[in-house]
């Protein structure tokens, strides 16, 4: 019961923390992590568009979610622009602060989900101009994503701010803008003429492969950190869900690109039936990789639940929305696999998971509104714009290091006592 009371005060208590500040002053602490909520909202719209079992009004619900996402994305762009103009120097500080710069890709990912949602929610109700708009937006996004990703990786390598004990799953985010180029292509390919569809299929596969291989490298580094240092503090563990998305989105992208290629152009590559071969290979690869996504989901879920059951202090973070987008990939992958292997059971599982992730999304929205009201977000020292790692996080790692040192000393003493005992036995035996 004590833990329940603690969690209530941390996540649901409506008492205001700290003296009231004007919203204009609080916007100095509006960080890139806020775009994770727009990214997650766009993901919910994408899930809604793929439901296998549909009912009257579901498409209207998807349109409402899409419009809501566009609204908050516009609001966030205005807020981050206001911060950079009103408080000079915060833009350069953002780029140099590893706690904040890792979430900069979420802004591009939020835009990417908006482009992806144009096909199910705008294309059927507009004219030929929407085909051109989708195509132009896609290739502009590809160019911007490539420039941004190279710049961000160079910046991180140049500053090298991380050590093995501060490695976090969010390190995979910098490659996401390139990887999401494949996801966008898979979502919009059927809106394009055959020749343009072929270009998108080729680019989508290439970018998805790039994202997946970089993910494998970062995933190995994270596993090394988990084995040697342990899990993160409880409040940061929802970020582990980020590791779910790359294998899931890779399977989803390959499947949807294959479906689009088959619908638009049977000879997408060389050969009369190359699209059918692509669909077979895509289904095989999606089945091959979905196990990794499910494993990462289960590991993250158990870690989060275990963290919530401890007495560690937990503070809501807007970056928790990243787990919505990550799990959206797994849900959509399951739904499209059900379509590929013609299994209603798999489609039902995917739909149930989609409803579940939508409920979690609503809960996170309520937690966000509450955190803004009580000044646990958009407040000095409470967001990702801090110059250093949070003191409680550093204390957590210091505690782990002290435990490791104590354990090493105990093991050393036991070994010395064992050696001394063996020596005495040998000496007495010789006498």
UniProtKB/Swiss-Prot annotation:
- Identify one Gene Ontology CC term for this UniProt entry: membrane
Where composition is biased (Basic and acidic residues), the residues are 402-424
Which superkingdom, per the lineage?
A: Eukaryota
Membrane topology designation: Multi-pass membrane protein
The places in or outside the cell where this protein is found are: Membrane
Belongs to which family? Belongs to the tellurite-resistance/dicarboxylate transporter (TDT) family.
What's the name of the protein? Putative malic acid transport protein
Give the source species.
Schizosaccharomyces pombe (strain 972 / ATCC 24843)
